[in-house]
């Protein structure tokens, strides 16, 4: 059975999928058996045959040169670009933890280092109906995963990143580190954001990703040690 790491973002559109692709690519280029899994994906676009295409999973599969079929990489796919709980309700396909856990465990059995990507931020609702209330952090906790946070380097990131760290700690979920995305070297505000986040949380920023980067600048042993 392999090791796993969960990737969350401080919100939507912070570049979580982009960074996840770089992480899996880094592992695989180092000769390691690195894989990808996502429980639920919304906003999928149909192809010419009407089949929904899970864009995030397809992107990581392409960037990291993953050979597994796309059906192994994501469990629930919805066309609406909504929060998963709403997309699931509209399509009458509620997210079932038992099915997610089964697919997750299968993915772990196939990969030595499995990177699981979340949906939106850590408090994203996955299911909210008369039978069950399940947020993304519930899923992470029940799967016993540590979390790596992807944060936008720009204005507003101090608040979002510190709140994400504090929420994870309140839920007793291990925080493995932070990756700063959309970083501009020499930008005084972004550098101050990084310093303030590290001082306020005690969590290290492990890598800085610039726009257009095709490689993740992080020591491979450090990256491997984030997985458990």
Q: Across the structure, where does each feature detected by a protein language model lie?
A:
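C-terminal lobe/tail of nucleotide-utilizing enzymes
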Residues: 165-228
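Hydrophobic anchor at the beta1->P-loop junction of P-loop NTPases
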Residues: 7
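Switch II (G3) loop of P-loop NTPases
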Residues: 100, 104-132
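Inter-motif core of Ras-like GTPase G domains
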Residues: 129-153
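Conserved glycine(s) of the Walker
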Residues: 14-15
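Charged helix-capping and loop-helix junction motifs
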Residues: 129-137, 162-164, 190-195
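N-terminal phosphate/diphosphate-binding loop that engages ATP/GTP or pyrophosphate donors
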Residues: 4, 18-94, 98, 103-106
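Histidine-anchored nucleotide/phosphate-binding helix
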Residues: 24-28, 136-140, 159-169
């Amino acid at each position: 059975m392999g090791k796993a790491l969960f990737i969350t973002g401080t919100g939507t559109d912070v570049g979580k999928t982009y960074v996840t692709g770089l992480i899996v690519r880094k592992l695989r280029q180092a000769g390691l058996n690195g894989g990808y899994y996502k429980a639920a994906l919304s906003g999928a676009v149909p192809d010419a045959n009407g089949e929904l295409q899970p864009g995030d999973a397809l992107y990581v599969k392409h960037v990291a040169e993953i050979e597994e079929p796309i059906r192994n990489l994501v469990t629930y796919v919805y066309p609406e670009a909504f929060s998963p709980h709403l997309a699931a309700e509209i399509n009458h396909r509620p997210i079932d933890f038992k099915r997610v856990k089964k697919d997750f465990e299968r993915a772990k059995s196939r990969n030595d280092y499995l990177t699981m990507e979340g949906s939106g931020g850590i408090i994203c609702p996955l299911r909210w109906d008369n039978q069950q209330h399940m947020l993304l952090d519930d899923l992470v906790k029940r799967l016993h995963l540590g979390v790596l946070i992807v944060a936008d380097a720009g204005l507003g990131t101090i608040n979002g990143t510190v709140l994400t760290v504090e929420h994870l700690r309140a839920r007793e979920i291990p925080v493995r580190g932070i990756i700063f995305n959309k970083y501009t070297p020499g930008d005084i505000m972004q550098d101050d954001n990084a310093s303030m986040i590290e001082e306020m949380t005690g969590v290290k920023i492990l890598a800085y990703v610039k726009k257009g980067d095709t490689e993740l600048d992080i020591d491979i042993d450090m990256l491997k040690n984030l997985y458990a």
